[in-house]
Amino acid sequence: MLDSKLVRTQLQEIVGRLATRGFQLDVARFESLEAQRKAVQTRTEQLQAERNARSKTIGQAKSRGEDIAPLLAEVDRMGSDLEAGKRELDAIQAELDALMLSIPNLPHESVPVGADEEDNVEVRRWGVPRTFDFAIKDHVALGERHGWLDFETAAKLSGARFALMRGPIARLHRALAQFMLDLHTGEHGYEEAYTPYLVQAPALQGTGQLPKFEEDLFKISREGEADFYLIPTAEVSLTNIVAGEILDARQLPLKFVAHTPCFRSEAGASGRDTRGMIRQHQFDKVEMVRIVDPAKSYEALEELTANAEKVLQRLELPYRVLALCTGDMGFSATKTYDLEVWVPSQDKYREISSCSNCGDFQARRMQARWRNPETGKPELVHTLNGSGLAVGRTLVAVLENYQQADGSIRVPEVLKPYMGGIEVIG
């Protein structure tokens, strides 16, 4: 959530920066609610001051032996008016809060301005896509060859956009996740966490999925109890570890990593990536989250992105890094890098990781703070998150990039210890 004081004092600048994201702030509504809030707040404060003064008068009149019944009646009336004013102020503030929760983060000045993914800027590439001397297969054909990747049975169980993995491919999927966790904990300094897969609405509001993107979530309604939501990413549970906390400066940076399933309705993805594992309702992801000193968050973004890149480098998978433009960034991000891995069957790079600095946007929603030793006061932290990596899409890339002419798959060198020494699948 943006700082409401910043929006009030720099409204036109904020409107302009949001417009680069394709977001049109309802200025008339904001100014109307602000005017109402100020008027009611002023009236309520004046009424409170008058009531306090009248209350003092009652004591003085009583000591003089005067009839205080009229004064008591007036104070009671003022009390009723004051309660009504507070209720009105609360209602206006609730509308303002709802409006503020609908506004995306401001793009950092270094973010390229653009409308959509066509305006993203390539930053660098690593590796060279392999040249095949045989007709390549996609991951679906490779996986179904021995029944180790079974979309038909998955559809029987759960419908479209699910996968059933068996045998060596299931093991390879597990090996990838274990390798990613070991790399991030052993070399990159992250603390592994096991988090709930079900969270309540405040956690999703804290990281920005609610209230705006509820249709993208799977919701479990419970009669008489708070609803549950299946996590769309471990970013939600990991980042909310610090919700409502005031951290000591010595605790920063916090670096968490978790391997979880992720659940998404893919409400806006009708007709896209209907074949295979690229876009699923349920998929595994290794997620990295950092909680940092605000002065160090952009440096932390570069490190976070490098951590995700290291996974692809160790797997020897060609990839590129994109700086997302203003119109393609996620709701909570102020700056984002996407990693795209080479997918031979599609002859193009596909997203496999998104690494974002959210600044104080999520922290303000969560009230996650640290005590700044220079001021001695609690201040908002900065939060970052990134995929390190999406396990299913990494599996797709491994299957396709390591395929051989006979349809078998070479196991990447770095995964062999996790595969019991198996060198070839199929």
Curated annotation (Swiss-Prot):
Keywords: Aminoacyl-tRNA synthetase, ATP-binding, Cytoplasm, Ligase, Nucleotide-binding, Protein biosynthesis. It is an enzyme of class 6 (ligase). L-serine binds at T233, A234, E235, E287, S387. It catalyses: tRNA(Ser) + L-serine + ATP = L-seryl-tRNA(Ser) + AMP + diphosphate + H(+); tRNA(Sec) + L-serine + ATP = L-seryl-tRNA(Sec) + AMP + diphosphate + H(+). ATP binds at R264, S265, E266, E351, I352, S353, S354. One of its GO terms (molecular function) is serine-tRNA ligase activity. Its EC number is 6.1.1.11. Pathway: Aminoacyl-tRNA biosynthesis; selenocysteinyl-tRNA(Sec) biosynthesis; L-seryl-tRNA(Sec) from L-serine and tRNA(Sec): step 1/1. One of its GO terms (cellular component) is cytoplasm. It comes from the Bacteria. It holds the Pfam family tRNA-synt_2b. GO terms for biological process: selenocysteine biosynthetic process; seryl-tRNA aminoacylation. It is found in: Cytoplasm. PROSITE patterns: AA_TRNA_LIGASE_II. Transmembrane segments: none annotated. Belongs to the class-II aminoacyl-tRNA synthetase family. Type-1 seryl-tRNA synthetase subfamily. Homodimer. The tRNA molecule binds across the dimer. Catalyzes the attachment of serine to tRNA(Ser). Is also able to aminoacylate tRNA(Sec) with serine, to form the misacylated tRNA L-seryl-tRNA(Sec), which will be further converted into selenocysteinyl-tRNA(Sec). Consists of two distinct domains, a catalytic core and a N-terminal extension that is involved in tRNA binding. This is Serine--tRNA ligase. It comes from Azotobacter vinelandii (strain DJ / ATCC BAA-1303). The gene is serS.
